[in-house]
Amino acid sequence: MEILLATTNLHKIREFKEMCKAFAHLEILSLHQFPAYMCPEEVGTNFKENAISKAEHAAKHLNRWVLADDSGLVVPRLSGKPGIYSRRFAGLEATDEENRKKLLLEMRQLINKEDRTAYYECCLALSSPTGLQKCVQGICEGFILNEARGRNGFGYDSLFVKNDYEKSFAEIDEAVKNRISHRRKAFERLSAFLENLRD
């Protein structure tokens, strides 16, 4: 059975394909295979609303089962920023490095580790052409470093250290990150549903 990932993000595609290896009956596609499709504008006020909107829109317009992800970094002491604007925190065309620099700038007065707590949040929405079927959430808690460390990962990974770990998400092996990430936690809550999903 085919499931379309509503993303063109190569990092996310690779991560999801790795997690889906346990489900031999599923074939994972991405929006790279549907270049004419136009994603809806993200107008939700939280990750859940955006994930559902992306999943339902693609499922309806492409007449397929669709799995959509909306995720980002939340810093409570910054009133939840960057939050749903994680990918475009420093501007619509901002690079990962520019987004990280803006985050560090906004956190420059937060010296104590307890003031630098943060968490990654992921919401996954699974939709069929007839509508939403399942929506789940995963969270990974940690804190923000004073400077970037590591070369793996993407986004804010080089600034984020998971609680009980010493290395940033960009310093640990990708396979390890994929076992402990917010996306993995959300995916595990979807696993039973995917296991029973058939054409």
UniProtKB/Swiss-Prot annotation:
InterPro entries: dITP/XTP_pyrophosphatase, ITPase-like_fam, RdgB/HAM1
Keyword list, A-Z: Hydrolase, Magnesium, Metal-binding, Nucleotide metabolism, Nucleotide-binding
Binding-site residues for substrate, renumbered to this chain: T7, T8, N9, L10, H11, K12, S71, F154, G155, Y156, D157, K177, H182, R183
Cofactor binding comment, as recorded: Binds 1 Mg(2+) ion per subunit.
Entry's Gene Ontology cellular component terms: cytosol
GO biological process, one term: nucleotide metabolic process
Disulfide bonds, paired cysteine numbers: none
Residues bound to Mg(2+): E41, D70
Top-level taxon of origin: Bacteria
Record has Repeat as a keyword: no
Protein family: Belongs to the HAM1 NTPase family.
Role description: Pyrophosphatase that catalyzes the hydrolysis of nucleoside triphosphates to their monophosphate derivatives, with a high preference for the non-canonical purine nucleotides XTP (xanthosine triphosphate), dITP (deoxyinosine triphosphate) and ITP. Seems to function as a house-cleaning enzyme that removes non-canonical purine nucleotides from the nucleotide pool, thus preventing their incorporation into DNA/RNA and avoiding chromosomal lesions.
PANTHER family registered for this protein in UniProt: INOSINE TRIPHOSPHATE PYROPHOSPHATASE, INOSINE TRIPHOSPHATE PYROPHOSPHATASE/HAM1 PROTEIN
Protein's UniProt name: dITP/XTP pyrophosphatase
